[in-house]
Structure formats: structure tokens, C-alpha cells
């Protein structure tokens, strides 16, 4: 229950991982917070979403894993470490309720949710209100605190609120499902086979006639690839997802099912492209990759949204010439998911440009994953509390995992020229951080074997991130 304070409250809408973390950070900063959660309406006592099973805060609907806890060599483990440094509620409760999972951080999900709920309920500056916020938050009146709001409603945002955001932002700025194509680390692409060229050498807005990476296939390779797509196991939609297909965004395996030649007349068409190494031989099909971030470290497979199970995606896509050793920053998928076009709508402190009283946090911003969602809640909570105190703060530097996520969702992503739908949710990965040169020798001056230099580079990037976060916190 909120106690007397010199500050007006901040309102947080949504009691998932992001909203719970945001509320905690605000309260820990000495600012009262009102957390609105619709999953149990006080008037009816009903849980009113399609996927949740309880009314507990920070309920983990799908997996019980926060993925790798290795801060030295794994980007999500680095994000864990940064959040722990900043007093994360989610990480503290996860550590308290972890279960054996090898190098991963997995939790007893009931114990975890109960702990989050208990800590927030017992905090003297937190008030939890069980209600749905239908539509946009109420207008501020100078006393009610609605001038400082965090929207952390997640992939199951209520229809009324989703429609209100859509009305505010305009058609095309809010997506109701994600159609995710795989993303590949540039350094793992074999450029001895692939080449850069835009179709018909057409220049884009940036004046670049070689904006795509092209991976050629002969007929035999194409036929084998189609066989693998058709045979590969597919993920089924959950009952509550109710995700529609539409022709502009069909999974590649669905296109292949419509006919073996469909893909080579669609996203894999070879027209307007010439292999500079063998210009007289025309490829039977071509897979194109498009730059996905401003750093040029990540490239997405154009038109390759897929429901293939993750276990077979890498194996299948490594059949493509030039991608034999591809390392994936993100695998493909198609899910129900409500998220905004953050690069156009949000500033660097995750405020909506059109209505700065509103901040967005969690999956609704276009991050993917439990940890990433909680991380955005952590930052928005700190931003909102700092604003309430009259001392705004900047985001962490982009060399940190936290800062890299903010940079990506607010500006690091490159639009593809085909509308807002090109922005898709992203997990944390080292490709979002400014690159470093792979070290050739270790701290003792010993030569690092070539195959281990990529791993050594990740450790240097993690060390840089934690050092830069310490400087930001100071």
C-alpha cells in the first residue's frame, strides 16, 4: 500500500515481468507507484486473459527458463549480470527460486511468481490495483499521477487498450502478431560464395546498389532444400494465439506446400542478380539477406518467416550455399504478439513521442524474451522515477546489453522500405553491441587459437559492458 510521499505516484499498467520490475525500480527510488493488473478483476474475481493460469504477478506462461547465466560468453547472461548490478527484482527472485538447469537459470515458476507478488505487495510505496485499464490511461489532472505512465501490457494486451494505442499512433504502427525471419551474424556468412548486390542494381534510399547479400542455389540444391522444408517438423499454434496467415507474410514452408516452384518465384527468385564469380551461369534460386542493424553485424533472411521447429531451422538453413557455418542471432517464428513500431514511436527514454507522458516497456516495445522484457521494465522504471524527481537520466551506453536493446528498438533497426512491418521482435545478442576486434593473444600474452578468438571477443565485449555500466551508475 502506498504511504504518504512528497511525490505523486507513477502508474504502471501490466503486472507481468516488465511491469513488476518497473514498479519495483520506481518504489526503490523512493517514488510511490500504482500497479494495475487486469488478470484478476476485483469486481468479478476472474482471470481474464487467454493464456495465464493464475493471478500472480510475473507469471511465466511458456518456459520456466531465463536462458544462459554465463555473463562472459553469452549475451543474455551478460544481461542477467547487468540487471543484478541494478538491483533487479526479477533476477533476485529468480536466483532465490532457481532449479537445476545446467548453465541456464531456470526457476520454480510458482515459487518465483509468488515471491515477486509478495515483495511488491509488502513494499510500502507500492499499491496493486486489480482492474483493466480500458483504452488510454485517464488524462492527468495535476494530482492523480497519470502524467507519468508505463504501459507494460505484453503480448496479450487487452483489445480496448490495443485499439486506443492504434488510434493514437496510426494504422500500421501496432502489430498483433510477429512474423520473424532468422537473423544471422555477418561474420559467419561465407562471402567466398555469397556476394553483395541489389536486384537489378537498384539503389535504395541510402544510394547503395549492393544492399543485399545473395546466396545462390543450383536446381539440385534447391530441390534438396524444398524437401527439407516440407519434411521438417513445424510448431503448432497454441489455442489462444489465433494467428492468421496472410499472403504477404506466409511461412516459407507453407509457400513450399503450395508448390515446389513457389519459393523461386517469390522470396527466392533469381531475377536481376548476377554472380560476379560466374556471370554466365544463372542461379536457379537465390536467398537474399538484408542488413538488419545500423552496425551491419546482423543480417536477416528476406521473406524467411517460418514455423519450423527451432531444432531443425539451423540445420535446414545451413543447406543454403554461403550459410554452411551460419551463426543465428535469432531463429524464425510466427506468434501472437502485440508490439508497437518502436523505432518510429519511442524516444531514447522509451517515451511515446506523440504523448510523452506514456512510456512503454517489455514485449510491447519489440524485445523478445522474459529477460529482455524485464530489462526494459527496469529501465523504464528508473526513467519514470527520475522524471518524477525532476532529474531525468539517459539510457545506459550502447556498449552495454541494456543500452544495446534500447538502441535497437529506438533506432538501431534499419527499415527495409516496405513499411513498419519490417520491425520485428529481437532477443539480446552480441550483434546488437558495437563490435570489437577479436583478440589474437590472451591476458598472459599467449596466442589464442583461431577457432577460439570469437569466444574471446565475446568475453572482451562483456567486460567492456560491465565496466561501462559501472561508469553509468556512478
From Swiss-Prot:
Top EC class per UniProt? transferase
Q: Which reaction does this chain catalyze?
A: uridine(54) in tRNA + (6R)-5,10-methylene-5,6,7,8-tetrahydrofolate + NADH + H(+) = 5-methyluridine(54) in tRNA + (6S)-5,6,7,8-tetrahydrofolate + NAD(+); uridine(54) in tRNA + (6R)-5,10-methylene-5,6,7,8-tetrahydrofolate + NADPH + H(+) = 5-methyluridine(54) in tRNA + (6S)-5,6,7,8-tetrahydrofolate + NADP(+)
What are the required cofactors?
FAD
For molecular function, the Gene Ontology terms on record are:
flavin adenine dinucleotide binding; tRNA (uracil(54)-C5)-methyltransferase activity, 5,10-methylenetetrahydrofolate-dependent
- Please tell me where FAD binds in this chain: 14-19
GO CC, sorted alphabetically, is: cytosol
Q: Its Gene Ontology biological processes?
A: tRNA methylation; tRNA wobble uridine modification
KW Flavoprotein (keyword) present: yes
One Pfam match, by short name?
GIDA
The keyword Amino-acid biosynthesis is annotated on this UniProt entry: no
Q: Which UniProt keywords apply?
A: Cytoplasm, FAD, Flavoprotein, Methyltransferase, NAD, NADP, Transferase, tRNA processing
- Tell me the SUPFAM superfamilies matching this sequence: FAD/NAD(P)-binding domain (SSF51905)
Subcellular location, in the record's words?
A: Cytoplasm
Q: What is its EC number?
A: 2.1.1.74
Explain the purpose of this protein: Catalyzes the folate-dependent formation of 5-methyl-uridine at position 54 (M-5-U54) in all tRNAs.
User: Which NCBIfam families does the UniProt record give?
Assistant: gid_trmFO, PRK05335.1
Family assignment from sequence similarity: Belongs to the MnmG family. TrmFO subfamily.
According to UniProt, the name of this protein is Methylenetetrahydrofolate--tRNA-(uracil-5-)-methyltransferase TrmFO
Q: Which organism is it from?
A: Caulobacter vibrioides (strain ATCC 19089 / CIP 103742 / CB 15) (Caulobacter crescentus)
Q: Which gene encodes it?
A: trmFO
Amino acid at each position: 500500500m502506498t504511504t504518504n510521499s512528497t511525490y505523486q505516484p507513477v502508474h504502471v499498467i501490466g503486472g507481468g515481468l516488465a511491469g513488476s520490475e518497473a514498479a519495483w525500480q520506481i518504489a526503490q527510488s523512493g517514488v510511490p507507484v500504482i500497479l494495475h493488473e487486469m488478470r484478476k478483476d476485483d469486481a468479478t474475481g476472474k482471470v481474464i486473459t487467454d493464456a495465464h493460469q493464475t493471478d500472480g504477478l510475473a507469471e511465466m506462461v511458456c518456459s520456466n527458463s531465463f536462458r544462459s547465466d554465463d555473463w562472459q560468453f553469452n549475451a543474455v547472461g551478460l544481461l542477467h549480470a547487468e540487471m543484478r548490478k541494478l538491483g533487479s527484482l526479477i533476477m533476485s527472485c529468480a536466483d532465490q527460486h532457481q532449479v537445476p538447469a545446467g548453465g541456464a537459470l531456470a526457476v520454480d515458476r510458482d515459487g518465483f511468481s509468488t515471491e515477486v507478488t509478495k515483495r511488491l505487495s509488502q513494499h510500502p510505496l507500492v499499491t496493486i490495483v486489480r482492474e483493466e485499464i480500458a483504452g488510454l490511461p485517464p488524462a492527468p489532472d495535476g494530482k492523480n499521477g497519470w502524467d507519468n505512465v508505463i504501459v507494460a501490457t505484453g503480448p496479450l494486451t487487452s483489445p480496448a487498450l490495443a485499439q486506443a494505442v492504434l488510434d493514437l499512433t496510426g494504422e500500421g504502427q501496432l502489430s498483433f502478431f510477429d512474423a520473424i525471419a532468422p537473423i544471422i551474424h555477418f561474420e559467419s556468412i561465407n562471402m567466398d560464395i555469397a556476394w553483395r548486390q541489389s536486384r537489378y542494381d537498384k539503389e535504395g534510399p541510402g544510394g547503395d546498389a549492393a544492399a543485399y547479400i545473395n546466396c545462390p542455389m543450383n536446381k539440385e540444391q534447391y530441390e534438396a532444400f524444398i524437401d527439407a522444408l516440407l519434411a521438417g517438423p513445424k510448431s503448432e499454434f497454441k489455442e489462444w494465439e489465433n494467428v492468421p496467415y496472410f499472403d504477404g507474410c506466409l511461412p516459407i514452408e507453407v509457400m513450399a506446400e503450395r508448390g515446389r516452384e513457389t519459393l523461386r518465384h517469390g522470396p527466392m527468385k533469381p531475377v536481376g542478380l548476377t554472380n560476379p564469380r560466374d556471370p554466365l551461369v544463372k542461379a536457379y534460386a537465390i536467398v537474399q539477406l538484408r542488413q538488419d542493424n545500423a552496425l551491419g553485424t546482423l543480417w536477416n533472411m528476406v521473406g524467411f518467416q517460418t514455423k519450423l521447429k527451432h531444432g531443425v531451422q539451423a540445420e535446414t538453413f545451413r543447406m543454403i550455399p554461403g550459410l554452411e557455418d551460419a551463426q543465428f542471432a535469432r531463429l524464425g517464428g510466427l506468434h501472437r504478439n502485440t508490439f508497437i513500431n518502436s523505432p518510429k514511436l519511442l524516444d531514447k527514454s522509451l517515451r511515446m513521442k506523440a504523448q510523452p507522458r506514456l512510456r512503454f516497456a517489455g514485449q510491447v516495445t519489440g524485445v523478445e524474451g522474459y529477460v529482455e522484457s524485464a530489462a526494459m521494465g527496469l529501465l523504464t522504471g528508473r526513467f519514470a522515477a527520475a522524471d518524477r524527481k525532476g532529474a531525468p537520466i539517459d539510457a545506459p551506453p550502447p556498449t552495454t546489453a541494456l543500452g544495446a536493446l534500447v538502441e535497437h528498438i529506438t533506432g538501431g533497426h534499419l527499415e527495409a522500405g516496405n513499411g513498419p512491418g519490417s520491425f520485428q521482435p529481437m532477443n539480446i545478442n552480441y550483434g546488437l553491441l558495437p563490435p570489437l576486434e577479436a583478440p589474437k593473444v590472451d591476458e598472459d600474452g599467449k596466442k589464442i587459437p583461431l577457432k577460439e578468438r570469437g569466444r574471446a571477443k565475446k568475453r572482451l565485449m562483456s567486460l567492456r559492458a560491465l565496466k561501462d555500466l559501472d561508469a553509468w551508475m556512478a
